[in-house]
Amino acid sequence: MNVSVNIKNVTKEYRIYRTNKERMKDALIPKHKNKTFFALDDISLKAYEGDVIGLVGINGSGKSTLSNIIGGSLSPTVGKVDRNGEVSVIAISAGLSGQLTGIENIEFKMLCMGFKRKEIKAMTPKIIEFSELGEFIYQPVKKYSSGMRAKLGFSINITVNPDILVIDEALSVGDQTFAQKCLDKIYEFKEQNKTIFFVSHNLGQVRQFCTKIAWIEGGKLKDYGELDDVLPKYEAFLNDFKKKSKAEQKEFRNKLDESRFVIK
């Protein structure tokens, strides 16, 4: 089986500034030390054709940062991602302009993907039909609900038939009938040996469709492997975490975050 995505020692840092003065110092003074937050810290993993990888972890762990880097909308500070094929990212409102109508967004997004107008014209009816938006396709996206935006984004991205699909919580909004329709499409992609990264807090969906799990905790890759090996460990952790009081949960998160801040 061929490697479709190779994530090599990926780190994503953000400089933290309390004042504009600190920001100016950092810009003007070489090697000026400042507080830095590690959103991701030395992540490495390989995904193969046909892998459906669930990215799991509590809120703030770095899942969405990693999915954006895999998708190419965010660059790592250190490390690299090698992709063997075209990538599409599905997240709520990802790549959509609120000022444009739904049908204008279809054309705009597909032009950005490199499609010709003739190809876009041929695919647009399929996108509209899958989205189930009806006459709302002619309305500005800023008037859409989060579920409607997710429908449009998902419909565009699955119609262009990518080799690698990144889905970030896009199925967590909207009606369950459409969500199941999307999951059926994901299963089709899985059968076609496409590579899928699936970010979700719905462990039922993760268990149903994923073949592997990447558990992200505090910006680090805590575990990565086959679904049956990793998911039970994450579920046990999550059950223990949910039993904690709000104060204990906050303390746990704070300890994780403390390790992610450094002066450099």
From Swiss-Prot:
How is the protein disposed in the membrane?
Answer: Peripheral membrane protein
Residues annotated as binding ATP are: G57, I58, N59, G60, S61, G62, K63, S64
Q: Say if the entry is tagged with keyword Cell inner membrane.
A: no
Which terms in the Gene Ontology molecular function aspect does this entry carry? ABC-type teichoic acid transporter activity; ATP binding; ATP hydrolysis activity
Domain ABC transporter, first and last residues per copy: 5-243
Q: What are the annotated GO cellular component locations? A: plasma membrane
Record note on quaternary structure: The complex is composed of two ATP-binding proteins (TagH) and two transmembrane proteins (TagG).
What this protein is reported to do is described as: Part of the ABC transporter complex TagGH involved in teichoic acids export. Responsible for energy coupling to the transport system.
**Keywords linked to the UniProt accession:** ATP-binding, Cell membrane, Membrane, Nucleotide-binding, Translocase, Transport
The cross-references to PROSITE patterns, in alphabetical order and at most eight, read:
ABC_TRANSPORTER_1, ABC_TRANSPORTER_2, TAGH
Q: What is this protein called?
A: Teichoic acids export ATP-binding protein TagH
Q: Can the keyword Translocase be found in this entry's annotation?
A: yes
Compartment(s) of residence = Cell membrane
Q: Which domain of life is it from?
A: Bacteria
Q: Which NCBIfam families match?
A: PRK13546.1 (NF010066)
The catalysed reaction is: ATP + H2O + teichoic acidSide 1 = ADP + phosphate + teichoic acidSide 2
Q: Which family does it belong to?
A: Belongs to the ABC transporter superfamily. Teichoic acids exporter (TC 3.A.1.104.1) family.
CDD domains xrefs: ABC_KpsT_Wzt (cd03220)
What EC class is this? translocase
Q: What is its EC number?
A: 7.5.2.4
